């Protein structure tokens, strides 16, 4: 079963330089991907999709969790992701602008990230 991962930049609207932040995120993600063993590599690497969101697909939950942990530990101060993980079938829907990822795995990941976001909104800064 595939594992869908959504990553959302925490506080992206408050970042002083969103463009520079994305460059740093891209570099950190590339570093983590290079350093992970082949057995933990994503099937589809973590890449931006829209706004401050990114998506990846992993073969196992172990691989997804290892990637997420390493990514969080590698991010510099001031940059943070929140994650949603969904386990289940995923597929692509053809579009004139490229394939769109869809399916129960993505729906579960979206539901998970929505729960995390709602809980973070209720915390004291």
Language-model features, listed with the residues they occupy:
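Regulatory and interdomain segments flanking nucleotide-handling catalytic cores
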Residues: 1-125
């Amino acid at each position: 079963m595939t594992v869908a991962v959504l990553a959302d930049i925490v506080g992206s609207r408050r970042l002083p330089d969103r463009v520079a932040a994305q460059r740093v995120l891209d570099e950190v993600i590339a570093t983590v991907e290079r350093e992970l063993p082949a057995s933990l590599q994503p099937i589809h690497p973590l890449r931006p999709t829209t706004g401050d969101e990114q998506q990846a697909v992993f073969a196992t939950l172990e691989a997804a969790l290892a990637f997420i942990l390493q990514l969080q530990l590698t991010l510099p101060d001031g940059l943070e992701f929140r994650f949603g993980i969904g386990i289940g079938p995923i597929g692509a829907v053809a579009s004139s602008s490229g394939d769109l990822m869809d399916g129960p795995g993505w729906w579960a990941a979206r539901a998970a990230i929505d729960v995390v976001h709602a809980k973070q909104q209720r915390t004291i800064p």
